[in-house]
Amino acid sequence: MSNITISQLLALSLAKFNQCDISTKHDLQMIICDVLGVDKTYLYINLDKQLDKNTLKKIDEKILRLLAGEPLAYILGYKYFWNQKLYVTKDTLIPRADTETVVATVLDDIQNKDAQLKILDLGTGTGAIALALAAELANSQVVAVDLYQQSLDVAKKNAQANNITNVKFIQSSWYTNLDTDKFDIIVSNPPYIDLADTNIDQSVKDYEPARALFAADNGLADIRIIISQAKDFLNLGGFIYIEHGFTQADAITALFSQCNFTDIKIVKDLNNNDRCTKAQLGYL
């Protein structure tokens, strides 16, 4: 394949996919933009531009990965979340738009954005939640925890790339390596998919780290640890926010109640699915 235009390349590439929908076209456009180092506006006004052999080879290599089912974020090496460009690797879960619901909920609950809050993000991965909150709450201090050093390395790189300095990174299994300081807010997007769940997209199963996705006890094992120990790390009147699957809200509400949390509320995502449950330690 040589001396073809961007428009021709798009048409030929789309024809290789069984499902030629808007999403596939978007992914192909993003791959071409990434290789060319341009944005989609450039692409639209230069559809007749011819591509040289070396450029075509680079694009074709990435398209083959897309055909194999590899998620676009891993092919590009990044994903945008809360207006931040986040690097991703095979060691990290790909940030989802649904998780922005959790960030928005936390921010909506904070009346004074200039307050000096202490925030804990458990299972930070790419740092998506921690960095979004740190960027919006410049006077607050965020502690981002992950069990895996490879994930923390990615999160640190993302903090540096986005010029965010009010985040401290700690390698820990949930609360294990934390000191006795308490937090005003705890937030987590932990593994919550049931080990027996068969409704997972094949690309997710094949490419994303299982350790960040699946949990025992109907997907509740890690959530149970986070909630049951939260009172030792949360200030009185502080809030905890847990992202979860859309069928788990009732079980998580029960866990919060058993641990004497109050003001328990379920938050829906943009698809109107239960996505996050929040609770307060102390007052109603």
Swiss-Prot record:
Entry-linked CDD domains: AdoMet_MTases
InterPro entries: DNA_methylase_N6_adenine_CS, HemK-like, N5-glutamine_MTase, PrmC_N, RF_methyltr_PrmC, SAM-dependent_MTases_sf, Small_mtfrase_dom
Keywords (A to Z) from UniProt: Methyltransferase, S-adenosyl-L-methionine, Transferase
Catalytic activity: L-glutaminyl-[peptide chain release factor] + S-adenosyl-L-methionine = N(5)-methyl-L-glutaminyl-[peptide chain release factor] + S-adenosyl-L-homocysteine + H(+)
An example Gene Ontology molecular-function term: nucleic acid binding
Entry EC number(s): 2.1.1.297
Binding sites annotated in the UniProt record for S-adenosyl-L-methionine: G123, T124, G125, T126, G127, D146, W174, N189
Enzyme class, broadest EC rank: transferase
One Pfam family hit: MTS
Binding site for substrate: N189, P190, P191, Y192
PANTHER family per UniProt: HEMK METHYLTRANSFERASE, MTRF1L RELEASE FACTOR GLUTAMINE METHYLTRANSFERASE
General function of this protein: Methylates the class 1 translation termination release factors RF1/PrfA and RF2/PrfB on the glutamine residue of the universally conserved GGQ motif.
Name of the protein in question: Release factor glutamine methyltransferase
Gene coding for it: prmC
